[in-house]
Amino acid sequence: MSVTENGDDRTPSAPKHRQMLALLLMNANQVVSMAQFVEELWEYSPPPRAVAAVHTYVMQLRRILHGGATAVACGRLVTREQGYLLRVEDGELDLHLYESRLRAGRALLDAGEPDAGARLLRTADAMWSGTTGLVDAPTGPLLRAALAPIERERTEATVRRIHAELALGRHQELVSELCALVHQDLTHEELTAQLMLALYRSGRQADALAAFHRLRHALREDLATTPGPDVHRLTTDILTGHPRLEPPTTGHLPLTLDAVPTLVAA
């Protein structure tokens, strides 16, 4: 988390302040009620004077954000309807910019422009400085619930972007990235299937099969299940060297991946 204004660092350092600011930013330009603050900060065990503590934290947060000023009217954090609201203008919050680039990248993919769409999705993903959001701020139930769909959306966008890049014949460039992504989630079938295909197309059949066995083991141990039929078919095709797994001969193929037709986003 970082907050800057005209080059000045206004980032709060105390955990409660950071957590409150994160909740306000995740609900930018919307009222966060006192009940929401109490639930986020203390979950199911609020102290007797939780409401008073929230008021104190807000007062301190205002001073930090406003460079030591105490007047409510001089800043963006304002009192509204038994709660507080943080005003954020267009282009100020990186999350909003990320989501805008994500939508634009997906639109390009949908329009049949895999190269431009993949590049824009890569630009969006490069905005993340860590593997997950809010790595340096405490998260309670409300922040965890708000972050979950963002994380899912990011993973789905990554799958779509890699799908486009595989269709453009960039399998060798993708191997290292896919290895890292699969390492973060050993049970993710779509990413493992993409890794298997990239490895196979790079002349690494044995490594592609090893990736399948790691997936099967992780699914059995963690989820008590097995890989789906599409991953099994891909494995069979790798063993037999099916022609449909060959890399494209042109960078202008449609956005389909015959090797794993139902594992990638449409």
List the predicted regions and their residue ranges:
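Short amphipathic alpha-helical recognition elements used for nucleic-acid or partner binding
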Residues: D9-L41, L61, T187-L195
